[in-house]
């Protein structure tokens, strides 16, 4: 993995910082694990914008990732590491002994030729997936399930990880990167190690067009809009004079957005403020 700063041969290249990984596969992805992915432009089935700042971008195929890691007792070998345009993490194509191939998230340190396994009997080794009741306290894991059999939901982006800090009966306590500590059933699965490609956060796109290639549209300030478009819009100066709000009038500074009270009981400690 190398961090490359481009020479200023043009204004668009002057500030570009790239993350180069020579171990990534340079050919085409494995076709049977691809699915068509169509653009929405941030619109729902009524044609209304439900997510702002989305539109355009290069065409992509969705890679079917195995988040469940439920192929127990069958060893697999890593064939290659690949780039995935749909996520910040890299992915690994693994070949199981019975001939099946699957994509998984590539943990830090995994390379072509390594062997991995899933299930209760899997060893404590980076890339292996097993229930958290079988993982030692203090271990670093990723792709963590929140419900047994549902598939990993926590710690899936580049460089992400979760630490198992305690085990109490049928629950384990996890410390998330945000500082939050929460309980999860110990039968939930997790993959050992942390997600690779942690250098992703160091990249600099260098120009607006690089964001447009990725399907990201500009973010316009509310104060730069007209009154019809945003509560902050209009006026002769830049002063708003009220508490800042979203385009729909909801407070933006410190308002709680979590509404799932049913699972509040599993949160041992709230995330820390930045």
Swiss-Prot record:
Name the residue ranges with Polar residues bias: 39-49
**Quick check: keyword RNA-binding in the entry?**
yes
What biological process terms from GO does the record include? cytoplasmic translation
| Segments of this protein annotated with the region Disordered | 28-54, 221-274
Concerning SMART domains, the annotation shows: Ribosomal_L2 (SM01383), Ribosomal_L2_C (SM01382)
This chain belongs to the protein called Large ribosomal subunit protein uL2
Gene for this chain? rplB
The subunit field of the Swiss-Prot or TrEMBL record says: Part of the 50S ribosomal subunit. Forms a bridge to the 30S subunit in the 70S ribosome.
- GO CC aspect terms: large ribosomal subunit
| InterPro entries named among the record's database cross-references | NA-bd_OB-fold, Rib_uL2_dom2, Ribosomal_uL2, Ribosomal_uL2_bac/org-type, Ribosomal_uL2_C, Ribosomal_uL2_CS, Ribosomal_uL2_dom3, Ribosomal_uL2_RNA-bd_dom
- What are the protein's UniProt keywords? Ribonucleoprotein, Ribosomal protein, RNA-binding, rRNA-binding
Highest taxon of the lineage: Bacteria
The record's family statement is: Belongs to the universal ribosomal protein uL2 family.
Query: What is its biological role?
Result: One of the primary rRNA binding proteins. Required for association of the 30S and 50S subunits to form the 70S ribosome, for tRNA binding and peptide bond formation. It has been suggested to have peptidyltransferase activity; this is somewhat controversial. Makes several contacts with the 16S rRNA in the 70S ribosome.
* GO MF annotation terms: rRNA binding; structural constituent of ribosome; transferase activity
């Amino acid at each position: 993995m190398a961090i490359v700063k481009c020479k200023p041969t043009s204004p668009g290249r002057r500030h570009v910082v790239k993350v180069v990984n020579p171990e990534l596969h340079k050919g085409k992805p494995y076709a049977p694990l691809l699915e068509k992915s169509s653009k929405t432009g941030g619109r729902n089935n009524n044609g209304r914008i439900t997510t702002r700042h989305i539109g355009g971008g290069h065409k992509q195929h969705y890679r079917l990732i195995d988040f469940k890691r439920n192929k127990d007792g069958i060893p697999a070998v890593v064939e290659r590491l690949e780039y995935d345009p749909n996520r910040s993490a890299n992915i690994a194509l693994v070949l199981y002994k019975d001939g099946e191939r699957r994509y998984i998230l590539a943990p830090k340190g995994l390379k072509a030729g390594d062997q991995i396994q899933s299930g209760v009997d899997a060893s404590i080794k980076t890339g292996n997936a097993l229930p958290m009741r079988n993982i030692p306290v203090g271990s670093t894991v990723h792709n963590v399930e929140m419900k047994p059999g549902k598939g990993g939901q926590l710690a899936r982006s580049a460089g992400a990880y979760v630490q198992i800090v305690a085990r109490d009966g049928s629950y384990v306590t996890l410390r998330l990167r945000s500082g939050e500590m929460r309980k999860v059933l110990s039968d939930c699965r997790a993959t050992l190690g942390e997600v690779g490609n942690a250098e992703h956060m160091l990249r600099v796109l260098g120009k607006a067009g690089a964001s447009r290639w990725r399907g990201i549209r500009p973010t316009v300030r509310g104060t730069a809009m007209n009154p019809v478009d945003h509560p902050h819009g209009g006026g002769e100066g830049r002063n708003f004079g009220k508490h800042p709000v979203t385009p729909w009038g909801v407070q933006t500074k410190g308002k709680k957005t979590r509404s799932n009270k049913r699972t509040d009981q599993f949160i041992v400690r709230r995330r820390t403020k930045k």
